[in-house]
Amino acid sequence: MSDPVVRLRELRRSFSQGGVTIDVLRGVNLEIRPGEIVALLGPSGSGKSTMLQAIGLLEGGFSGLIEIAGTDASKLSGDDRTALRRDHLGFVYQFHHLLPDFNAIENVVLPQLVAGTDRAVAEARAAELLSALGLAKRLDHRPSQLSGGEQQRVAVARALANRPEMVLADEPTGNLDEATADRVLEEFLKLVRGEGSAALIATHNERLALRMDRVVRLHEGVLE
Ligand SMILES: Nc1ncnc2c1ncn2[C@@H]1O[C@H](COP(=O)(O)OP(=O)(O)OP(=O)(O)O)[C@@H](O)[C@H]1O
């Protein structure tokens, strides 16, 4: 078996609020294999976003092991963490966070330029991804000229642009109506599978979770 893309061992995180400490993650263990698509379920406030932030190396304050593509992130400096994130991870959020002044294709090209990809190669890759998501005729549209589902598709293309081994998605279809959410998730999963990326997708939707390879649940700070 190949090495996991993500390995968590005894991941812990507490927050202090008004003098009270809450232990949100109380020893989370998880391994995700290359290409595996995992649904992360759990009630509101159970710590799904906190867990994704840990794996995404976006926040500090965690204890335990966070290993990305075989590298122990806790041993890295800030710059090296940024490089590890950029080289291996892609992100999709509930709200797309697209750059409002750039059109669809530029939103997918820019992260590739940041990663050092040649512009012509980046443009071809962006056009291919957006076309696979049905947006071939929307390449020059700015986010404000796109529907909510189309905006989220651009965000999916952006997350995959640098060929991440792992996509982290936090309620990626949570702000869409049910029919659109189903369609966007379907396309997202198809594209992720086609690319061979792994994914960890936090969702409240049990029905959509059943379309993934494995379901894990956060309950009282641990995965079950
Ligand atoms: N920066 C913070 N400071 C204090 N408390 C926090 C912070 N971030 C998260 N929390 C608390 O940690 C708990 C878990 O939050 P988190 O957002 O991870 O849950 P979630 O499962 O993603 O919820 P939802 O499904 O509603 O998005 C909540 O009680 C929240 O209030």
UniProtKB/Swiss-Prot annotation:
Pfam families: ABC_tran (PF00005). One of its GO terms (molecular function) is ATP binding. PROSITE patterns: ABC_TRANSPORTER_1, ABC_TRANSPORTER_2, LOLD. It is an enzyme of class 7 (translocase). One of its GO terms (biological process) is lipoprotein localization to outer membrane. InterPro entries: AAA+_ATPase, ABC_transporter-like_ATP-bd, ABC_transporter-like_CS, ABC_transpr_LolD-like, MacB-like_ATP-bd, P-loop_NTPase. Keywords: ATP-binding, Cell inner membrane, Cell membrane, Membrane, Nucleotide-binding, Translocase, Transport. GO terms for cellular component: plasma membrane. Its EC number is 7.6.2.-. Belongs to the ABC transporter superfamily. Lipoprotein translocase (TC 3.A.1.125) family. Part of the ABC transporter complex LolCDE involved in the translocation of mature outer membrane-directed lipoproteins, from the inner membrane to the periplasmic chaperone, LolA. Responsible for the formation of the LolA-lipoprotein complex in an ATP-dependent manner. This is Lipoprotein-releasing system ATP-binding protein LolD.
